[in-house]
Amino acid sequence: MSLDKIMNEAISPWMKGDGPDSDIVLSSRIRLARNFKKYQFSTMQNEEEAKQIQELFKKEFINKTVEPFGEFELLKMNELTPLQRRVLVEKHLISPNLAGTEYGACLLSESEHISVMLNEEDHIRIQCLFSGLQLSEALQSANQIDNWIEKEVEYAFDESLGYITSCPTNVGTGLRASVMIHLPGLVLTKRISRIIQVIQKLGLVVRGIYGEGSEALGNIFQVSNQMTLGKSEEDIIADLKSVIQQIIQQEKMARELIVQNSSIELEDKVYRSYGILANSRLIQSAEAANCLSDLRLGIDLGYIQGISRNILTELMVLTQPGILQQYAGGPLGPEERDYRRATLIRERLRIEKN
């Protein structure tokens, strides 16, 4: 695997999957926060300590195969251009926080299912991404990588508290589980605000597509646990999965209600959005996301035939500003980005129909 391949293949293999409940759940993510006993926290460490952690991973983990993930590549943030960092964020392989660090790095698997972020808020953050509702499977993979790393380093661990992390909400298991979910039915029936309030009362967090502080573009929301202390990994996963399954049922009921009461209006909305995507010469990110959401809903409900439902996930990534500029070979102005976004969407839809 090379940096060029990572940059030029915008669609990660996990995005092409068709996991359980993938008509509503786009992806499942597990993240484990860990710190090393011998180093100060990332928020307090100096340049030399940050470099030592990079060198440790370069020595112990590069060009070593871990089945079934293949080999890993180390990407140092200070060796990447700002555009390359942005592409990694838009592909969900690193956090915006890591992209802004000078001595951060990412250990990335061939399949891009696994990324280990170094020198972010914690010394390492192990991330596993799976398509559909596969939290248990993602946790199993994360634990496998966690055990692999722990053979070479000693973690900061307290017998009574668990794993010690920079942020108090991560102390304990250090586990953050999240699900990316497409909820156009609940948005259209204006039930989403009530659902979010209920979710938050259960101790869960609702965010946009790129995590904290991001917007819920295209009716896509991230739902995750908040506290990790006092619960086992299995309990955290079970609680989140139970809530997600209830949200799935609420979304299905909302879709059925719209079809029963406003079928022709919904079909019109879907085909109008399809027409915009198939014919526009200029389209901004927000409009593209909303139209792609309508198109995906139309595919799921059977209004649109012959187009893969994965098109929402693929084009939501492909049409992000960083990836558009990466394909163009350099910076683009806003109007040029809108032009290239519209062109890419038209061509992608044309390929699907043929």
Swiss-Prot record:
One of its GO terms (biological process) is phosphocreatine biosynthetic process. Its EC number is 2.7.14.1. It holds the Pfam family ATP-gua_Ptrans. A motif (RDXXRA motif of the pArg binding pocket involved in allosteric regulation) lies at residues 337-342. Keywords: Allosteric enzyme, ATP-binding, Kinase, Nucleotide-binding, Transferase. It catalyses: L-arginyl-[protein] + ATP = N(omega)-phospho-L-arginyl-[protein] + ADP + H(+). Catalyzes the specific phosphorylation of arginine residues in a large number of proteins. Is part of the bacterial stress response system. Protein arginine phosphorylation has a physiologically important role and is involved in the regulation of many critical cellular processes, such as protein homeostasis, motility, competence, and stringent and stress responses, by regulating gene expression and protein activity. Belongs to the ATP:guanido phosphotransferase family. This is Protein-arginine kinase. It comes from Bacillus thuringiensis subsp. konkukian (strain 97-27).
